[in-house]
């Protein structure tokens, strides 16, 4: 038997017990004739004691143990004289009588500690060592608990977990597919699913009225902190439902997860916000509502006073940062440089302070009377000590997005984005379509299977850009954690949708004929939602990136530096797949 207990299990009630432990050497220290070793496994740390006076040979062997050696010990549980309140086993120690070295270890390239000295690249290369760290391991334990709670919740509501294929056909609409060549069918390719979207709709046609799957999904797209080329969805679909049914079901799931995993009781219904309001007041379809700073439009007040930057702008708007009038010129200049960064793209920033006597002092005083500045102050509801920050531009949507970045930056600087505070909302009434300059046509904002709002269906023939989708996203603290829609279940409406999106009947049949044909055999009204498991875990764990809640993630270039993937394959494999590699030079 390698162990009778784990390294996180023993307590003061176990004193005088004979036990056996196995684990890794975390650290060792020698004090006089005593050697102390912290033994670690995934359950915790237990202090081992070797006494030179009792057994000099055993103590000498203990002194030769290196970091991360794998050892087995047998000994007696003893009450610890100098207790450690920071760990659950801090009241006890083990007086070791037997030591067995199970394996030696090279010195790790970084310290296996919560606060490691390893950078991201080295940690990713030696991910199997990084996973020994409590800070990373606890994220995977949280992920495990979340999947258990998801399954329990959905099972209690009659959902059935069904696995769908990972090798499917390619559908070029949307993000790029990862493709897999077929050896058995030369010149033909599978695609890895971006989501099980069409397959779960087919399950609804099949009569599986409540489906879910914890599904691996793949998208060949540029990476960010909250994106990986492969990610995991809590994928769900329901038949005979309307939007309200789905929102109720999955708001319930969110509340269940908050209660069981974070101990947070969310009793109030989640706020609902139309997409148009989210963009108008926050410049984002995933607004962070942990703090205020709602946008105020100032075109009526600030235009027409001789300040050409505002006079020539299509949009003038700002935010009010409460109590921030103490910002220095240096801080304001830094904010100006922040919004002028290429990835944000503003031309500049105007600011105004509300003084203690209620007067307003701005960076454009020479163009505006105090009367106009007071009107501006009233529009914001600003008080003495507040700071008003204003952006303008000739593209309304672009300027709102720039103002969104400024709002988030101010929220961070003022300590308003507390990771232990959670504000949830549903964003609803999305546009059905968005114009693609690159494609020169309307594109589906979500996907082509989204049902339009019933009252907007007549607009499909007259003004498709004005059609709203029966779609909904759940947003928590400015992060989109899930989204879904009511689906089209009528073959004629689906064909009309493809037509608006520029599909010829032949192209629609070639790519989605299997779904349109299925609809002819009695498709029920249905809809669904997919939660991002990685995003939920990172949110609950307080992480800035989803990478640390994935066991073996890719880096920002989409590479697995531990496995050195992607990599070239040998010529024999290429020949079997009937492939020729022809890499074009960058011009």
UniProtKB/Swiss-Prot annotation:
SUPFAM superfamilies: Class II aaRS and biotin synthetases, GAD domain-like, Nucleic acid-binding proteins. It catalyses: tRNA(Asp) + L-aspartate + ATP = L-aspartyl-tRNA(Asp) + AMP + diphosphate. The keyword ATP-binding applies. The keyword ATP-binding applies. One of its GO terms (biological process) is aspartyl-tRNA aminoacylation. One of its GO terms (cellular component) is cytoplasm. Its EC number is 6.1.1.12. HAMAP family: Asp_tRNA_synth_type1. Belongs to the class-II aminoacyl-tRNA synthetase family. Type 1 subfamily. This is Aspartate--tRNA ligase. It comes from Bacteroides thetaiotaomicron (strain ATCC 29148 / DSM 2079 / JCM 5827 / CCUG 10774 / NCTC 10582 / VPI-5482 / E50). The gene is aspS.
């Amino acid at each position: 038997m390698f162990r009778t207990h784990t390294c996180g299990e023993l307590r003061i009630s176990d004193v005088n017990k004979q036990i056996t432990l196995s684990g890794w050497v975390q650290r060792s220290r020698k004090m006089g004739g005593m050697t102390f070793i912290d033994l670690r496994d995934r359950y915790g740390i237990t202090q081992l004691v070797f006494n030179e006076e009792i057994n000099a040979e055993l103590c000498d062997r203990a002194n030769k143990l290196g970091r991360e050696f794998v050892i087995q010990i047998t000994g007696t549980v003893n009450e610890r004289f100098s207790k450690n309140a920071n760990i659950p086993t801090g009241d006890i120690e083990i007086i070791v009588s037997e030591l067995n070295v199970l394996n030696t270890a090279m010195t790790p390239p970084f310290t296996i500690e919560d606060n490691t000295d390893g950078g991201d690249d080295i940690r990713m290369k030696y991910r199997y060592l990084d996973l020994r760290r409590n800070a990373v391991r606890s994220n995977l334990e949280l992920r495990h608990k979340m999947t258990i709670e998801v399954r329990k919740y959905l099972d209690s509501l009659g959902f059935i977990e069904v696995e769908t294929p990972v090798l499917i056909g390619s559908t070029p609409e949307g993000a790029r597919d990862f493709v897999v060549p077929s050896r058995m069918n030369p010149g033909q390719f599978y695609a890895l699913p971006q989501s099980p979207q069409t397959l779960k709709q087919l399950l609804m046609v099949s009569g599986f009225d409540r489906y879910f799957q914890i599904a691996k999904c793949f998208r060949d797209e540029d990476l960010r902190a909250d994106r990986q080329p492969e990610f995991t969805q809590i994928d769900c679909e329901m038949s005979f439902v309307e939007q309200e049914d789905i929102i109720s079901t999955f708001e319930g799931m969110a509340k269940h997860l908050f209660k069981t995993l974070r101990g947070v009781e969310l009793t109030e219904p989640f706020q609902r916000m139309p997409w148009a309001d989210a963009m108008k007041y926050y410049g984002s379809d995933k607004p962070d509502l942990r703090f205020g700073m709602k946008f105020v439009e100032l075109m009526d007040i600030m235009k027409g006073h001789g300040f050409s930057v505002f006079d020539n702008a299509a949009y003038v708007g700002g935010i009010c940062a409460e109590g921030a009038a103490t910002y220095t010129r240096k801080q304001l200049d830094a904010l100006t440089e922040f919004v002028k960064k290429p990835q944000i793209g503003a031309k500049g920033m105007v600011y105004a302070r509300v003084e203690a006597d209620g007067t307003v002092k701005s960076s454009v005083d020479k163009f505006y009377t105090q009367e106009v500045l007071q009107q501006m102050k009233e529009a914001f509801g600003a008080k003495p000590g507040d700071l008003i920050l204003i952006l303008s531009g000739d593209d309304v949507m672009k300027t709102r997005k720039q103002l969104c970045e400024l709002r988030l930056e101010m929220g961070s600087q003022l300590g308003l984005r507390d990771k232990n505070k959670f504000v949830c909302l549903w964003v609803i009434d999305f546009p059905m379509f968005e114009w693609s300059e690159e494609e020169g046509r309307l594109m589906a904002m979500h996907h082509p299977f989204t049902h339009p709002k019933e009252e907007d269906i007549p607009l499909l023939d007259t003004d498709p850009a004005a059609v709203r989708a029966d779609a909904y996203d759940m947003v928590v603290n400015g992060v989109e954690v899930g989204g879904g829609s009511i689906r089209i279940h009528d073959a004629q409406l689906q064909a009309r949708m493809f037509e608006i999106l520029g599909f010829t009947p032949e192209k629609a049949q070639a790519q989605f004929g299997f779904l349109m044909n299925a609809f002819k055999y009695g498709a029920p009204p249905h809809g669904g939602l997919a939660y991002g498991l990685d995003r939920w875990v990172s949110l609950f764990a307080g992480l800035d990136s989803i990478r640390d809640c994935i066991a073996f993630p890719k880096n920002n270039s989409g590479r697995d530096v531990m496995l050195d993937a992607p990599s070239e394959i040998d010529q024999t494999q290429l020949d079997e797949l009937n492939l020729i590699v022809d890499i074009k030079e960058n011009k």
